[in-house]
Structures are given as structure tokens and as C-alpha cells.
Amino acid sequence: MKTSIFKSLYVQVLTAIAIGILLGHFYPELGAQMKPFGDAFVKLIKMVIAPVIFCTVVTGIAGMESMKAVGRTGAVALLYFEVVSTIALIIGLIIVNVVQPGAGMNVDPSTLDAKAVAVYAEQAKDQGVVAFLLDVIPGSVIGAFASGNILQVLLFAVLFGFALHRLGSKGQLIFNVIESFSQVIFGIINMIMRLAPIGAFGAMAFTIGKYGVGTLVQLGQLIICFYITCILFVVVVLGSIARATGFSIFKFIRYIREELLIVLGTSSSESALPRMLDKMEKLGCRKSVVGLVIPTGYSFNLDGTSIYLTMAAVFIAQATNSHMDIFHQITLLVVLLLSSKGAAGVTGSGFIVLAATISAVGHLPVAGLALILGIDRFMSEARALTNLVGNGVATVVVAKWVKELDAKQMDDVLNNRVPANKTHELSS
């Protein structure tokens, strides 16, 4: 029995995270040296993200009967993203005003090390809506795949899928080749995922060894407040959306538990992207919907990042005694509605977006970013986990709204009545 338990990726990753925490705490110098293991795993995952998105989107679109369905799916997805991410921003704003984790700190901004955040402030200057939209268009197809820019690859894949669909029977050979290539890529992903425990161990050992548990204690109130808010958002907001769509958020979380642990260990929701594409399709969502919603959601539907941005900005104001009345906070909300999309496609961009927002708002000290620089790494876990669950729920919701969801398949899989690797034929 024990052997079968430890063959589970879920248990292996959980054990690796625990060992990483212990090593980082008791042997911090050694723990900090484990960083290459985490970096290597994330790089391996990033290596296959572009081809898996391309194959999934192309075969999904080219295999559809009507191209109008693709446009409808995209429009519904963007509407959902905007509404839910706005709710996340507002919830973060309300909670941080009620709890006030930064009140009483009385930090003088002039005493903070502005140099520590200078690099983030500099990067933030390049993050704008126009720059973001232009960046979606790749300089070359090869460049899009080489850089691993999700939105650039997605744009090319959508255009390729449309063009292949228009070829009709003439494009069948190309379609078959891409579908076979997709199976090869998922085979590579299965091999890479065997290294997930090593990657999670290295990333967690580095985090604890580098920043220490002491960092958590110093600004613990903000961290606890943020984690509780993320949990409430998942259970209450996403839970209500899930219930209205016909499934349990808790059963869904159990279904993607391995992906959640991988994200917890690496602090990167991108590390689970390839597996999420596969799992959401096996859950009963049509491939074309999964291929559009998941990659787009990684830029437009980052609920955890939205909560973090409003909470962190107001926390800095509270800690530095910077006055923020209701008009300032509404301005902050409006700016975040734009800036949170402007850099969301960049991995680990939460801190950069925060720097861009504070610079744009104007009346908050940029040096105040130094207050949360040390704990940002610890908050990234909650951000990434919430983002992952949010994108999974979004995929099911959009699939149901556009009538591309096999409800029976979803119900059977979530209730363990049928293995997730068995799928029913989805009716058109």
C-alpha cells in the first residue's frame, strides 16, 4: 500500500516540498544553492508550452464545423475575464481597508532602500496598454516560439487554425501531422513531470534558505491577510460560480490537486499550463475552448494577481502614512484594470505591475515597494494557486455558456465514476 501511495505524483511533490522547507530552514546556505533544480524544471516546462498551445489551438479550431463558434467563445471568455478580475480587484481593496495590515507601521519612505526596487521600477516603465497590444504581434513566427510569448504563439495558432480550416479536405494531411505531433509533445510532458518533485524541492529550499522564516514573521499580517482573502475568493466567489455552472469547487480542486502542488512548489502557474490543457479537455471541455481560454486566461484572468495588486498598493499607503481617500482608491482601481492586463503575460510580473501602478497613481512612494520586496516571493504561491483555479473554473464556465461542455463527462470524472483519461464523445 505504501509503495502505491508514493508512486503518486501528488504525494511525491508534497514530500519534496516538505523536505525543501526543512532543508532551507535548518541549512539555509545549502538550501539557497538548490535554486538550479527549480529553475531547470520551470525551463523544461516552458520549453514545451509554445508547441503544446500551438497544437491544441490549431487542431481545436481546424476541427470545428463553424468559425463563428470561435469568435463567440473568445468574446464570452474576455467578458468573463473582465468581470471576475474586476471583482477580485474590488475584494482585495475592501479587505485591505477593513483589516488595515499596514496601519501603525509609520514607515518613513526616505529611510527605505529605493535602489532595491529600482530595477522593477525601470521595467515597469515599459509596461503599458499600447505596448502590450503591440507586443501581441510577433516580429516573426520563429521569434514568437523562441521567446515563448504565450499571446504571440496564441495569435499565430489562431490564424493558422483558421487558414487550415478554410483548406478543408486539402489540409487534412497537415491536420493529422499536427495532431500526431501534439501526442508526441504530451509524451514529452509526461516525462518532464516525473521531475516535478525535484523541481518543487529545489524551488522551495531556495525560497526558505534565501529569505528565511524571519521575513514571514516581520510582515506576517499582510501575508496572512492575503492568503485568507485568496482562500475566501476561491471558496466563495469561484465556488458560487462553479455551483451555478453545475459542479463543486472542492471536487474540482481535488481533480487538479497535482497541478496545484506543482504550482505551490515552483510559484509559477505556467508550470502547470501544459497539464491543465490536457486535464480540462479530459474533464469534458471541447479542445477548441480549452485552447483559447486557458492560454488567454494566463494574461487576462489572473484573479490572485488582481487581489495582490490592490492589497499591496493600499498596504504601502497605510505603512507609509500616505493619504488615500475614496477618489484615490477609485483611481487606483481604474489604473489596475488596465495595468494588470498590460504585463500579465510576463512570468512573475506581479511586482512589476505593482511598480507600474504606483508610478502611474503618483501619490504613493515608489520606495515603499521595498517594504514587500522580501515577502513577494512568499505571496507568489497564493497568487499562482488562485490564478490556476480561476482559469480552470473559467474554462468550464465558458465551455458551458457556448454549449461545448460534456456535462456527463465532467460529472463522472469529478465524482470518480470514470477515469479522467476516458472521454465521451461531445455532441456538436
Swiss-Prot record:
<feature type="transmembrane region" description="Helical">
    <location>
        <begin position="289"/>
        <end position="309"/>
    </location>
</feature>
<keyword id="KW-0997">Cell inner membrane</keyword>
<dbReference type="GO" id="GO:0015366">
    <property type="term" value="F:malate:proton symporter activity"/>
</dbReference>
<dbReference type="InterPro" id="IPR036458">
    <property type="entry name" value="Na:dicarbo_symporter_sf"/>
</dbReference>
<dbReference type="GO" id="GO:0015138">
    <property type="term" value="F:fumarate transmembrane transporter activity"/>
</dbReference>
<feature type="transmembrane region" description="Helical">
    <location>
        <begin position="326"/>
        <end position="346"/>
    </location>
</feature>
<dbReference type="InterPro" id="IPR023954">
    <property type="entry name" value="C4_dicarb_transport"/>
</dbReference>
<keyword id="KW-1003">Cell membrane</keyword>
<protein>
    <recommendedName>
        <fullName>C4-dicarboxylate transport protein</fullName>
    </recommendedName>
</protein>
<keyword id="KW-0769">Symport</keyword>
<feature type="transmembrane region" description="Helical">
    <location>
        <begin position="44"/>
        <end position="64"/>
    </location>
</feature>
<keyword id="KW-0812">Transmembrane</keyword>
<feature type="transmembrane region" description="Helical">
    <location>
        <begin position="8"/>
        <end position="28"/>
    </location>
</feature>
<dbReference type="GO" id="GO:0015141">
    <property type="term" value="F:succinate transmembrane transporter activity"/>
</dbReference>
<feature type="transmembrane region" description="Helical">
    <location>
        <begin position="142"/>
        <end position="162"/>
    </location>
</feature>
<keyword id="KW-0472">Membrane</keyword>
<comment type="function">
    <text>Responsible for the transport of dicarboxylates such as succinate, fumarate, and malate from the periplasm across the membrane.</text>
</comment>
<feature type="transmembrane region" description="Helical">
    <location>
        <begin position="76"/>
        <end position="96"/>
    </location>
</feature>
<feature type="transmembrane region" description="Helical">
    <location>
        <begin position="184"/>
        <end position="204"/>
    </location>
</feature>
<keyword id="KW-1133">Transmembrane helix</keyword>
<feature type="transmembrane region" description="Helical">
    <location>
        <begin position="352"/>
        <end position="372"/>
    </location>
</feature>
<feature type="transmembrane region" description="Helical">
    <location>
        <begin position="222"/>
        <end position="242"/>
    </location>
</feature>
<comment type="similarity">
    <text>Belongs to the dicarboxylate/amino acid:cation symporter (DAACS) (TC 2.A.23) family.</text>
</comment>
<dbReference type="InterPro" id="IPR018107">
    <property type="entry name" value="Na-dicarboxylate_symporter_CS"/>
</dbReference>
<dbReference type="GO" id="GO:0005886">
    <property type="term" value="C:plasma membrane"/>
</dbReference>
<dbReference type="GO" id="GO:0070778">
    <property type="term" value="P:L-aspartate transmembrane transport"/>
</dbReference>
<dbReference type="Pfam" id="PF00375">
    <property type="entry name" value="SDF"/>
</dbReference>
<dbReference type="InterPro" id="IPR001991">
    <property type="entry name" value="Na-dicarboxylate_symporter"/>
</dbReference>
<keyword id="KW-0813">Transport</keyword>
